[in-house]
Design a protein with these regions (language model features):
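Short, Lys/Arg-enriched N-terminal segments with co-localized hydrophobic residues
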Residues: 1-20
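N-terminal beta1-alpha1 ligand-phosphate binding loop
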Residues: 22-47
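Low-complexity, compositionally biased segments
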Residues: 7, 13-14, 39, 63, ...
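Short acidic low-complexity segments
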Residues: 54-65
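Exposed boundary/loop context
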Residues: 3, 10-11, 28, 71, ...
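FMN-binding flavodoxin-like domain, especially the glycine-rich phosphate-binding loop
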Residues: 22-25, 47-52, 66-71, 76-186
Length: 186
């Protein structure tokens, strides 16, 4: 239920994405190929009350016992990775906070497109209570592939932009990304 006002009584109130959870238990479930999404998961775990955490780890049946799920993914071809999509498709009647990383950054529109694709795998009985995405560094092999492509006379017109994006991504998720995530959580 959406809240317009918060009244503090004798228990902790956590506000997240317009929803109020009174000491609600949660699980943090994530998939991380390069460690970027794991960093976001660790930050969420650091912020939230540890005693309310039912599960922290990769997709597992134990993680779905909580009503509130923080679900993290890495981006694969404009969508969440297949393990996360499979996990999401099985959920019913949950509150879900989506978080993820993508190698291509600098475009909120791109992040929104990814999140839109991810949400298509989520049953309508679930409620999305929040979402966050940021850029994440990519494996060095990606840059090597771009450089090799550039050597070809038939390389893509945007190859220099791809290499530049790769180099910008090396520091992500960075302190600013973590602060933005924190602000979404608290």
């Amino acid at each position: 239920k959406l809240i317009n006002q918060v009244v503090l009584i004798d228990y902790t109130i956590i506000i997240l994405g317009g929803y109020c959870m009174y000491n609600e238990n949660y699980s943090i479930i994530f998939s991380s190929m390069t460690g970027n999404t794991r960093k976001l998961a660790d930050k969420i775990h650091e912020i939230l009350p540890k005693e309310s955490c039912d599960y922290f780890g990769t997709a597992d049946a134990q993680g779905i016992k909580s009503e509130l799920l923080y679900i993290g993914f890495w981006t694969d071809k404009g969508n969440a990775d297949s393990d996360t999509l499979d996990f999401l498709s099985k959920l019913k009647n949950k509150k879900i906070f989506l978080f993820g990383t993508a190698g291509f950054g600098g475009s909120n529109a791109y992040f929104q497109k990814i999140l839109g694709n991810v949400k298509m795998s989520i049953d309508s009985s679930n409620t999305i209570v929040g979402e966050y995405m940021c850029q994440g560094k990519m494996p060095q092999s990606v840059r090597e592939r771009y450089v090799k492509m550039k050597e070809s006379p038939k390389h893509p017109d945007n190859i220099d932009a791809l290499i530049e994006n790769f180099d910008k991504a090396l520091s992500h998720p960075d302190a600013d990304d973590m602060e933005q995530l924190k602000n979404m959580i608290i």
